[in-house]
Amino acid sequence: MATLWRLSVLCGARGGGALVLRTSVVRPAHVSAFLQDRHTPGWCGVQHIHLSPSHQASSKAASLHWTGERVVSVLLLGLLPAAYLNPCSAMDYSLAAALTLHGHWGIGQVVTDYVRGDALQKVAKAGLLALSAFTFAGLCYFNYHDVGICKAVAMLWKL
């Protein structure tokens, strides 16, 4: 972690003594938290910069989630042509699961990035979970009671 301990700036009218600040501009988070209540003379209303995030997630969980997203994306690349070449109920249900999971994770990232506020984000994620569950249930219902996803797409292409 790069730390800047001294900074030479023009700050004040006292001449050479005021040119060199004896305080750090960027401190490690533990030092910054320790010195948070201390007032630094000559440093006008500048807050400390924290270098570590306030909420840290497990790097293993994030890595596994990222890997899972990539596996589903690559699986879809092979599953779509296979469903075209061999339309059957196994392909229909595989497509239903993979497309729903892929859409859930993608829209979940949009919710995480753009929905602000803890309560609103929880409501949006609950709504997304309900939407994904209804989507999967609807696709499974369509596969069981109608022609299935593969044959439905083929019928649309024949129009």
Curated annotation (Swiss-Prot):
Cross-referenced Gene3D superfamilies: Fumarate reductase/succinate dehydrogenase, transmembrane subunit
Chain ranges on the Mitochondrial intermembrane side, renumbered to this chain: 86-90, 143-159
Source superkingdom: Eukaryota
Subcellular location(s) per record: Mitochondrion inner membrane
InterPro entries: CybS (IPR007992), SQR/QFR_C/D (IPR034804)
Residues noted as binding a ubiquinone in the record, renumbered to the chain: 114
Pathway note: Carbohydrate metabolism; tricarboxylic acid cycle
Residues of the transit peptide: 1-36
Membrane-topology descriptor: Multi-pass membrane protein
GO MF, one annotated term: heme binding
One GO CC annotation: mitochondrial inner membrane
Matches recorded under Pfam families: CybS (PF05328)
Keywords: Electron transport, Heme, Iron, Membrane, Metal-binding, Mitochondrion, Mitochondrion inner membrane, Transit peptide, Transmembrane, Transmembrane helix, Transport, Tricarboxylic acid cycle
Binding site for heme b: 102
GO biological process: mitochondrial electron transport, succinate to ubiquinone; tricarboxylic acid cycle
Transmembrane domains' residue ranges: 64-85, 91-111, 121-142
Mitochondrial matrix side: 37-63, 112-120
Assembly and interaction partners: Component of complex II composed of four subunits: the flavoprotein (FP) SDHA, iron-sulfur protein (IP) SDHB, and a cytochrome b560 composed of SDHC and SDHD.
Function: Membrane-anchoring subunit of succinate dehydrogenase (SDH) that is involved in complex II of the mitochondrial electron transport chain and is responsible for transferring electrons from succinate to ubiquinone (coenzyme Q). SDH also oxidizes malate to the non-canonical enol form of oxaloacetate, enol-oxaloacetate. Enol-oxaloacetate, which is a potent inhibitor of the succinate dehydrogenase activity, is further isomerized into keto-oxaloacetate.
Family: Belongs to the CybS family.
The protein's name: Succinate dehydrogenase [ubiquinone] cytochrome b small subunit, mitochondrial
Originating organism: Sus scrofa (Pig)
